[in-house]
Amino acid sequence: MLILDRSSPQIFISNEQQDVSIDLQSAQRLVVLFLELQKVSTDQVYVYFLDDTALAQLHDEQFSDPSLTDTITLPIDKPGIASFPHVLGEAFVSPKAAMRFLEQYTEDQLYHEISRYVVHSLLHMLGYDDQTDEDKRIMQEQEDVSLSFLAEHQALLRPAV
């Protein structure tokens, strides 16, 4: 687990899967720059990269649905709400889900898709929803804007070296 210094929000990143190599510092950079782009202040964010079995088990525990999914978000403190420490939430991401979704891919395409899953979870923490077609359209637009910004700043996920 890697943690940023205390002058920044604490970004807790944990890679608990072995399907895809994840550079933990790239995950931290993605979260920090996303928060800056969205102008969100928080004390803590948690991101866990899990294998399919662990994510399906969490899906069952949280939503009584044992099916595979790509990401689960557990928002904790809403942005702008006073709490200390302010914990924006927890993101649980399956890198292997990106492999299944893409089927054939380059390394860059794979890490872009996994980055999308992290951004998707972060947007849920900010209150975005994807229950209706209009909500999905708005969320997809925000994902695309965020991913473009992150790519420009070389802040997408990358493999560990």
UniProtKB/Swiss-Prot annotation:
GO terms for molecular function: metalloendopeptidase activity; RNA endonuclease activity; zinc ion binding. Keywords: Cytoplasm, Endonuclease, Hydrolase, Metal-binding, Nuclease, Ribosome biogenesis, rRNA processing, Zinc. Its EC number is 3.1.-.-. Zn(2+) binds at residues 120, 124, 130. GO terms for biological process: rRNA processing. It is found in: Cytoplasm. InterPro entries: MetalPrtase_cat_dom_sf_prd, YbeY. Its main location: cytoplasm. One of its GO terms (cellular component) is cytoplasm. The keyword Cell division does not apply. Belongs to the endoribonuclease YbeY family. HAMAP family: Endoribonucl_YbeY (MF_00009). This is Endoribonuclease YbeY.
